[in-house]
Amino acid sequence: MKKIVLSCLLAGSLGFSLPALAQGDYPTLSQLNQRLQTLGNQASVELKSLTKTAGGKDIWVLKVGTGNLDEKPAIAVVGGVEGFHVLSVELATQFAEKLVSEHAEKLENTTFYIFPNMSPDAYEQYHAALKYERRGNATAVDHDRDGTAGDNGYTDLNGDGFITWMRVEDPMGDYKLSEEDGRVLVKADRSKGEAGNYLVFKESKDEDQDGKFAEDLKEGIAFNKSMTFKFPVFEPLAGDIPVSQVESRAMLDYLFEQWNIFAFVTFSPANNLSSPLKYNAQNARKRVVTSILQKDEAINAMVSGMYNETISQKAYQQTNQGTDGDFFQWAYFHFGRLSFGTPGYWTPDFKGKDNPEANYLAWADSLGWNEVFVPWTEITHPDFPGKKVEVGGIKPFVMVNPPFEKVGEIAEEHTEFILKLAEMQPKLEIQNLEVESIGNGLTRISLDLFNNSPLPTHSEMGERSRWLRKIRIDLNAPNDRLISGEKIQLVDSIDAFGKTSLSWIIRGKGDISMKAGASHVGFINKTFNL
């Protein structure tokens, strides 16, 4: 209770209130923008709109820190990579608010880049009159390549304001009722001799009469399906080329100029924090690497352990460790940074039900959540004359986004995790310094440049990347005084709690200075009195 009261006092002193205590549902874009503008008024925060989407929505970034922000190691926190994952936007935004109001001391050593919502066009569907789990932006796209954009999307057949499912009784169907819960449909296992009873489609009509349903949605390109790593060519929502949208291009252009980022935390369906990625030697040796590298696997496992110690919810059915064209994998494979992803929330294991939907419904029933399921109701469907068609199923959003009153605790735990990760950032120190006269007016300077951190200065993937700078050591000595050693030295990487040894021989008296580091590990300066 004391912690909550203190948090409220701190937040109030900065001009904003903690949203988890102030409202009953996820914010609208207007409410979110107001909170971001309030944050942008703080001295430690720079709020910038990178661009506007096809729907006219701002893509915001918050750069949070003090002093020389660009020469401190940084963490990038990303929300809204999937438009239907509204929780992710709130977690990123609340992290920014808590960072500024409750943890300002962390800004002395670390800079934070926070991208609260990369899919604002799709996010808006949560508050629209017709609710469905949208991924694409507002760009007009012909997903089925029939010459007309968005001509066969969803249809609210029962008029309840939600897009759920429709099932058609058909002895040649692929689906049957689940034995775990009769409200749920599962694919019949033909290898076990199971017969199907239903055809299953998203709630829609065959508007273009091509025999397909909801294959040309009235939405554009999905941010989280259009990155360069394993780009899913010719798939709906991906576009014709990677990074084709103004928001994805603007973000990547911005990131390529932020040399100090050492790690990403992305709130998305992909999860390598509950369970770390596994190294695959064959995939790691390919020309196009598709496996986490061996040293980075160990880092992922260590950070995953810290995450599981920090987060109270135990992992269940967290099998998504990246999908083609997603941002989480791009940040590692193509940008060379440590990349960590988590949805932040999932349905817990309940009553031993294997099917995710059956498990969710059993859990929801136990909590008295009666508004999460649309009962199957028969309708008349123009595309299935003479057949029994029913509409129903789990409502959109509820399986991936908890009730808003639970978000405060989730945000608190994930803020704690991100700040723990910041404490692990690479940290250069000078150890074993010796300045000794060796006669004839010469002085030898020797030292160890030590990385006092459980993380290496570079991920193994980052060592291969042109987008992660090497450690540079500059000795400010006149050429005629430097007898031995290099004025400029580059070091590929320093291991966790590792070192690199340096030595110079200098002629004469007078101060000599040294600067060592890189933007993503920070810089240290030292003056030697000779």
What are the language-model segments listed below?
Residues 21-58, 405-409:
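Short glycine- and acidic-rich boundary segments immediately preceding or forming the N-terminal edge
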Residues 481-509:
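Intrinsically disordered, low-complexity Pro/Gly/Ser/Thr-rich segments with frequent PxxP/GP/PP motifs
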Residues 510-521:
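Short, aromatic- and glycine-rich surface loops/edge beta-strands on solvent-exposed regions
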Residues 46-47, 78, 90, 112-113, ...:
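Metallocarboxypeptidase
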Residues 522-530:
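Edge beta-strands of extracellular beta-sandwich domains
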Residues 7-17:
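Bacterial N-terminal signal peptides
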Residues 449-464:
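Short amphipathic, basic-aromatic surface patches that mediate peripheral association
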Residues 71-72, 86-90, 94-287:
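Active-site/substrate-binding loop(s) of hydrolase catalytic cores
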